[in-house]
Regions:
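Conserved catalytic-site region of short-chain dehydrogenase/reductase
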Residues: 112-123
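SDR active-site strand-loop-helix element
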Residues: 6, 30, 73, 106-111
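N-terminal Rossmann NAD(P)H-binding glycine-rich loop of SDR-like oxidoreductase domains
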Residues: 1-30
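Conserved beta-loop-beta element that borders a ligand/cofactor-binding pocket
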Residues: 110, 130-141
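NAD(P)H-binding glycine-rich loop region in Rossmannoid oxidoreductase-like domains
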Residues: 4, 35-101, 113-115
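Hydrophobic residues within alpha-helices
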Residues: 12-16, 94, 128
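General small-molecule cofactor/ligand-binding pocket signal
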Residues: 28, 48-50, 140
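A short helix->loop->beta-strand "cap" motif at the edges of active sites that frequently abuts
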Residues: 100-105, 136-137
């Protein structure tokens, strides 16, 4: 299966990449900066590393069209005041990119939330979950 892995430079993304390769998948890793991405030489023939910015919809054209599944592990986690807006826009662009594709499943890594007292970061993750949930693909959060 050809799987899109966003957040491939993060803690979970790096570890998930190896597991997905071990199970025989071809992985398309999207990163903001290729210089921050490293992988064992033994798996380089099973992955594609593509530099994209999910805030720039045009840059998503670099991603292959035949994606069959995806892991959405991106989180801004920046300290800027507008990170919630940026995360929402990234999720919308991801969802729009997936339109018309034969995607079997998307997995989104959110956070454990308490509806009564959400931090700004967890509130942002809930917003992303909502936006991704509007897509035409099955979503697991």
């Amino acid at each position: 299966m050809k799987i899109l892995l966003t957040g491939a430079t993060g803690y979970i993304g790096k570890r998930l990449l190896l597991e997905l390769i071990y199970h025989g998948h071809h992985i398309v890793c999207t990163v903001r900066d290729k210089n921050r991405f490293s992988a064992p030489a033994s798996i380089l023939n099973q992955i594609e590393v593509i530099e994209v910015d999910f805030l720039d919809f045009k840059s998503l054209k670099k991603i292959p069209q035949d994606i069959e599944g995806a892991y959405y592990l991106m989180h801004s986690m920046s300290n800027t005041h507008d990170y919630e807006k940026l995360e929402k826009q990234s999720a919308i662009h991801f969802r729009e990119f997936m339109k018309g594709k034969d995607v079997r499943h998307v997995v989104y890594l959110s956070g454990i939330t308490n509806e009564d007292s959400l931090s700004a970061h967890l509130s942002s993750r809930r917003t992303v979950e909502h936006e991704l949930g509007l897509g035409s693909y099955p979503l697991t959060t």
